[in-house]
């Protein structure tokens, strides 16, 4: 039976936060740099009169302009060539529908419906290893998690962390995660 690699979508596959911040900057005439965001609470970084409205921009249309994380497609292809089953596990926002699934297929990831999961608690999905940018999610995964470095998780100390897809694939080829 193939080992399963679970991949988060937001900011591991697709550059969602940079796209969201670009939209916010345009609408609110601001110059917020997504690389300065060091926490999950975006309301701490946007103008006070924007506040929670920042999350309203996470609708299905935003995914039309989301770019791919560098080397994500290459990395997924490498995992598949190495014989792993790749599944995409993501939390979904209200009013986004199938936008992430459609984005994946539009960008050549060739994902079947049974390899795409939307859920808040990713530990409910069976995988041998999870690559995610959310510290709490990786922590819940125990030894099965790898933290994908982003500015918002730099303050979190976690021993299994990668800064790029190239580094993740190198570690996979060297069997650093014991699969």
Question: Residues of each region from the PLM?
Answer:
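Active-site neighborhood of HAD-like aspartate-dependent phosphohydrolases
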Residues: 1-52
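Generic beta-sheet signal
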Residues: 9, 89, 148-150
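Short catalytic/ligand-binding loop motif for oxyanion handling, primarily in non-cytosolic enzymes
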Residues: 14-17, 22, 86, 95-99, ...
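Substrate-recognition element of Asp-dependent hydrolases with the DxDx(T/V) motif
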Residues: 63-67, 72-104
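A structural signal for isolated positions on well-ordered beta-strands in alpha/beta enzyme cores
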Residues: 85-87, 129, 146
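Structural recognition of alpha->loop->beta junctions
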Residues: 103-117, 162-173
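Conserved Lys-Pro-Asp/Glu-containing loop-to-beta segment of HAD-superfamily phosphomonoesterases
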Residues: 114-139
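Acidic, Mg2+-coordinating phosphoryl-transfer loop and its flanking beta/alpha structural elements
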Residues: 131-166
């Amino acid at each position: 039976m193939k080992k399963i690699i679970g991949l988060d979508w937001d900011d591991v596959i697709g550059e969602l936060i940079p796209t969201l911040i670009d939209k916010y900057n345009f609408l609110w005439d601001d110059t917020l740099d997504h690389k300065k965001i060091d926490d999950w609470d975006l309301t701490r970084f946007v103008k006070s009169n924007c506040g929670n409205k920042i999350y309203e921009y996470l609708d299905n249309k935003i995914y039309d302009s989301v770019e791919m994380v560098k080397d994500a497609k290459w990395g997924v292809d490498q995992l598949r060539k190495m014989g792993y089953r790749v599944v995409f596990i993501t939390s979904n926002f209200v009013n986004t529908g199938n936008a992430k699934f459609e984005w994946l297929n539009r960008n050549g990831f060739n994902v079947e419906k049974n390899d795409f999961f939307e859920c808040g608690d990713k530990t409910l999905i069976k995988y041998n290893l999870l690559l995610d940018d959310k510290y709490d999610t990786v922590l819940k995964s125990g030894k099965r998690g790898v933290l994908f470095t982003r500015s918002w998780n730099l303050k979190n100390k976690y021993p299994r962390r990668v800064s790029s897809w190239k580094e993740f694939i190198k570690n996979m080829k060297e069997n650093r995660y014991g699969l």
